[in-house]
């Protein structure tokens, strides 16, 4: 019996507690938003199959707890990840500053050459912005990775971010040469909606 997919990619979302990791995953996997999710304890995952350049890619997206007390649990899941999304909250400067610590954690625990992507969430809360887009863009370029600002609430750039990472993994894993793969690593596809003010405050 033929498989329902061509490739299986394990993705991992990391970042401080409260940046909206769970909301992003639920938005991507189920196209749903609820700001009453219980903060993740340990590890949970969702699955969605997407079409990338004619290939069916099954994405297994793992949600991790951001609290330091769960760090050992999170670390156990780094090694099998083919792509890691580092998430911060644009209204929380500390969560952005801690991205450097999460980068260090990836270097110490993940497989060499794992694909990474920087993601600034809650861009629907422009009035409360504390982290400027230029700051994150600079950080992403320093590390040679892509950057998106997203809103789990409005769904802005969520699919684009996950699909971009999946394309990069497919290319690296020997997929046929993809279109537009010479574009700079930092991308911002759309302007985020500034009207919505509700947030997903849980991890």
Swiss-Prot record:
InterPro entries: P-loop_NTPase, Small_GTP-bd, Small_GTPase, Small_GTPase_Rab. Keywords: Cell junction, Cell membrane, Cell projection, Cytoplasmic vesicle, Endosome, Golgi apparatus, GTP-binding, Hydrolase, Isopeptide bond, Lipoprotein, Magnesium, Membrane, Metal-binding, Methylation, Nucleotide-binding, Prenylation, Protein transport, Tight junction, Transport, Ubl conjugation. Ubiquitinated via 'Lys-11'-linked ubiquitination on Lys-58; impairing the recruitment of guanosine diphosphate (GDP) dissociation inhibitor 1/GDI1. GO terms for cellular component: bicellular tight junction; cytoplasmic vesicle; endocytic vesicle; endosome; insulin-responsive compartment; lamellipodium; lateral plasma membrane; neuron projection. It catalyses: GTP + H2O = GDP + phosphate + H(+). Pfam families: Ras (PF00071). GTP binds at residues 17-18, 20-23, 40, 66, 121-122, 124, 152-153. Its EC number is 3.6.5.2. Belongs to the small GTPase superfamily. Rab family. This is Ras-related protein Rab-13. The gene is RAB13.
């Amino acid at each position: 019996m033929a498989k329902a997919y061509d490739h299986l990619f394990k993705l991992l979302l990391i970042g401080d507690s409260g940046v909206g990791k769970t909301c992003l995953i639920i938005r991507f996997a189920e196209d749903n938003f609820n700001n009453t999710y219980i903060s993740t304890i340990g590890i949970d995952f969702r699955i969605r199959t997407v079409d990338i350049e004619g290939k069916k890619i099954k994405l297994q997206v793992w949600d991790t707890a951001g609290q330091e007390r769960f760090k050992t649990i999170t670390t156990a899941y780094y090694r099998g990840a083919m792509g890691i999304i580092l998430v911060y909250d644009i209204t929380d400067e500390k969560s952005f500053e801690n991205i450097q610590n999460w980068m260090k954690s990836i270097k110490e625990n993940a497989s060499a050459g794992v694909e990474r992507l920087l993601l600034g969430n809650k861009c629907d809360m422009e009035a409360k912005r504390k982290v400027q887009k230029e700051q994150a863009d600079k950080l992403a370029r320093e590390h040679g990775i892509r950057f998106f600002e997203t809103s789990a609430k409005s769904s802005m750039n969520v699919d684009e971010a996950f699909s971009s990472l999946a394309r990069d993994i497919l290319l690296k894993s020997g997929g046929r040469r993809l279109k537009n793969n010479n574009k700079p690593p930092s991308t911002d596809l759309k302007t985020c909606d500034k009207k919505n003010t509700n947030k997903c405050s849980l991890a």
